[in-house]
Amino acid sequence: MKQKITDYLDEIYGGTFTATHLQKLVTRLESAKRLITQRRKKHWDESDVVLITYADQFHSNDLKPLPTFNQFYHQWLQSIFSHVHLLPFYPWSSDDGFSVIDYHQVASEAGEWQDIQQLGECSHLMFDFVCNHMSAKSEWFKNYLQQHPGFEDFFIAVDPQTDLSAVTRPRALPLLTPFQMRDHSTRHLWTTFSDDQIDLNYRSPEVLLAMVDVLLCYLAKGAEYVRLDAVGFMWKEPGTSCIHLEKTHLIIKLLRSIIDNVAPGTVIITETNVPHKDNIAYFGAGDDEAHMVYQFSLPPLVLHAVQKQNVEALCAWAQNLTLPSSNTTWFNFLASHDGIGLNPLRGLLPESEILELVEALQQEGALVNWKNNPDGTRSPYEINVTYMDALSRRESSDEERCARFILAHAILLSFPGVPAIYIQSILGSRNDYAGVEKLGYNRAINRKKYHSKEITRELNDEATLRHAVYHELSRLITLRRSHNEFHPDNNFTIDTINSSVMRIPRSNADGNCLTGLFNVSKNIQHVNITNLHGRDLISEVDILGNEITLRPWQVMWIK
């Protein structure tokens, strides 16, 4: 393993990663091995379902947000989820946590490490490794601006005359931001995402050592899943797209080797919101990069299927899903703290259909974020909306909203891989326009924070949409977790019965089969399927004949 680490370092750095740097790294890894005593789960299974949430999601009058979350989780969520993905809980200055001031601390206004440790006693933990950039308010960046020894090349200074037209831009913002140094010179620094998020310079061995320290800290604090945020942008080469470069993949291989060495069983998940073929490249050879990749094409394809009442595009894509090894799987989701990405649709749907979907959602109140293209044009890259409101129309009844929403999540839970559900989804949340107006950015539409008493009251009120969604979705998750056919590694096929109905059989090594039927239309569907007998686990109705009737937006799990 140590030889593998050394080989990757040589490929990335050549002679610039010196024997002194290597000794520092080895010392840190040996120290981390002694500190990391918690045993990881050996392999994922059907019981693994992840909750995605902010650490400050709930507040109360007498406790800080993290202990308040722990109380809420214990009462409402612990029996449903196996893992909690706590979005960045470190001190931050912008982007709701993704502009990190200090990687090693918990934001004091949210709580402390002890609160996270307590959560880890009743749940597996997933942390964000915000590896591409850090806050302009951080000590590291202040030291850089002050030209302190050891920080000379922590960030990336570029001559503004450099031709950077080939660089992939995820935002409609300037790539370079000018900053004044202590000696009054001006440096133009690489800022992929915003002028408050300064890209780290991985050409510097000191940056690599500092970020490995961060990773080892998270492993010692109990992270069993580690999300590599915006990882595709880590290595920069002017004159190229600066995304998915070979040395980015080599750094991931290096981090994988380090994790396998000090905390075997830890799962690396890469976050690359890009077209599907680029996304799956982060599996590497199947045993040397990510254990899981975010299934970014799933949210917009499920949305497209329900909006169009047509499953053909979703099925055509899913029929080609292949994994490089049994050591890899998908990290499936429908909603997250970000919007619904459109880039993962490109290559799967014609651009005209993507724009048609965007326009339809805009008419229903969704907000759209745009990116600049190298040719000077701009394209929509993200729809900002709760998944609840994305699936339904303004005039829809709550009963219809709930049915469409549960249908979509049944598809999610039926797919191979580990499913993740965003806190706003399990809470049945609608668009938060007041939050957008107050905070001034589109993504706030799906990031509302709650007083714990307020949300508890709504969940207890049987007349509310929240109550219906929480209980129906909880029941669905519980069913999935108790049936081995849904194991991420088990056999998966998908086909269309007609343009509005699809079938997903899942079978295990014992030969047991569970078949999902999904009607994505507003119409009753009568389908003829031979030799499909058993009991629908959801409605608890026996299926005896060949003709099966599906109500609008109905799902069956037949076993």
From Swiss-Prot:
GO terms for biological process: carbohydrate metabolic process. It catalyses: (2R)-2-O-(alpha-D-glucopyranosyl)-glycerate + phosphate = (R)-glycerate + alpha-D-glucose 1-phosphate. Its EC number is 2.4.1.352. It is an enzyme of class 2 (transferase). GO terms for molecular function: glucosylglycerate phosphorylase activity. This is Glucosylglycerate phosphorylase. InterPro entries: GGa_phosphorylase (IPR033746), Glyco_hydro_13_cat_dom (IPR006047), Glycoside_hydrolase_SF (IPR017853), O16G_dom_2 (IPR045857), Sucrose_GGa_phosphorylase-rel (IPR016377).
